[in-house]
Amino acid sequence: MGQPGIDFPGLGVGLVILRDGKILLYKRVKAPEPSHWSIPGGKVDFMESTAEAARREAEEETGLEIRTVRLLGPAEVLSQADRQHWISLLYIADDFRGDPEITEPDKLSDFGWFGRNELPQPLSEFARAAIDFLGDTDLR
C-alpha cells in the first residue's frame, strides 16, 4: 500500500505553541528536514481529527498538557532532498500546562522559546509557514 508522505502525499499536523510572545521550536533529528528547527507535529491517525492529532503529537513530543488548539492554516511541504510530500493543517495553542522537555530524543535533540528576531536557523518549511501566519502581536 505504501507509506504516507513517501509513496503518496501524507496528511500531517503541526502545533504552534506560544508563551509570552515566543514560539516553541524543536530541532529535528530525522527526515523530513533533519537538523532543522520546527514546530511539534506529525501524522494524522486514521479516524482521528486533525485538532486531536495536533494536540496528541505536541503532548507526545513536548511533555506539555495542551488544553485548547485553534486552526491557524494549511501548509504543504515538498522536500525533494528527503523525497517526502506532506499536506498539513497548522494549529496554535497558548493554553497549556507544564514545561517543555525532550521526550523523544530519537526524533528531537534540542528546544527553545524564540521571538521573531531571534529565530534559530535553519528553520523547517513547516516552521516558516507557521511563522508567516502569525501576526506581530502573536510573535514578538
Task: State where each predicted segment sits.
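Short connector loops at helix/strand junctions that flank enzyme active sites
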Residues: 10-12, 18, 39, 66, ...
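Active-site-adjacent beta-strand/loop module that shapes the phosphate/pyrophosphate-binding cleft
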Residues: 75-100, 130, 134
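NUDIX/MutT-family hydrolases
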Residues: 92, 101-133
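Conserved Nudix-box catalytic region and its N-terminal flanking loop in Nudix hydrolases
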Residues: 22-60
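Conserved N-terminal beta-strand and adjoining loop/helix that marks the start
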Residues: 1-23, 74, 92
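A generic structural micro-feature
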Residues: 5-9, 36, 81-87, 105-108
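Short, charged/polar surface micro-motifs in flexible loops or helix N-caps
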Residues: 18-23, 31-33, 45-46, 77, ...
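A short coil-to-beta-strand element that immediately follows conserved catalytic motifs
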Residues: 65-73
